[in-house]
Amino acid sequence: MKLLAATVLLLTICSLEGALVRRQAKEPCVESPVSQYFQTVTDYGKDLMEKVKSPELQAEAKSYFEKSKEQLTPLIKKAGTELVNFLNYFLEL
């Protein structure tokens, strides 16, 4: 009977010590994934800024904007003319 009581007491003490050790251990930081995400975004931003500085990309962007301006200018003028005609129609009523 004493052996059984000693065994139960020993098991109880061991499990309590194990729980205490688990509580004292550092928990994994919750901020770690968030900080990793922001670090990744920062790295991508730096890489993007390096790529934007290249003259080839700047020339390509400039030609793209000039081409879109050439294509959109007639459409905008036509839309403006049609808007004026539309408003004149209502003013003549």
From Swiss-Prot:
Gene3D superfamilies: 6.10.250.100. Keywords: Cleavage on pair of basic residues, Disulfide bond, HDL, Lipid transport, Oxidation, Phosphoprotein, Secreted, Signal, Transport. This is Apolipoprotein A-II. InterPro entries: ApoA-II, ApoA-II_sf. It holds the Pfam family ApoA-II. Coiled coil: none annotated. Residues 1-18 form the signal peptide.
